[in-house]
Amino acid sequence: MPRQGIDPAQGRSAVQRVLASIDAGDTVDRAALGIAVRHFAGLLRERAPGHSVEVRIPGPIGTAFQCGEGPQHTRGTPPNTIETDPITFVRLCAGRTDWSAAVAAGEVRASGARADLSALLPVDLPED
């Protein structure tokens, strides 16, 4: 099935701009951050198809998606939920932040037996 969503070149460019801003201590461009978040979300959905875990990146530039094999959740609050902010999500996906360290620092809130993305991180950025 062909991937839909963010163009790979646009996604890579946005990720690079966001990481460069973070590294320089500059304000991160919100448009680039939104593209980077959605790009990584799409890549994670491809890498771990399914509906067992709900990943939430709240806010106007955030998103929510389901991934991971296992029981599908259909009503109410999902039993396996991960929530983090957009910058932490990009840093995790890019390999700039360790999963367990982010959870320990409270940058990621994960609940449920399947709420662990560590085996999927970092996310490789595909070529065009």
Task: Mark where each language-model region is.
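Feature captures hydrophobic
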Residues: M1-D128
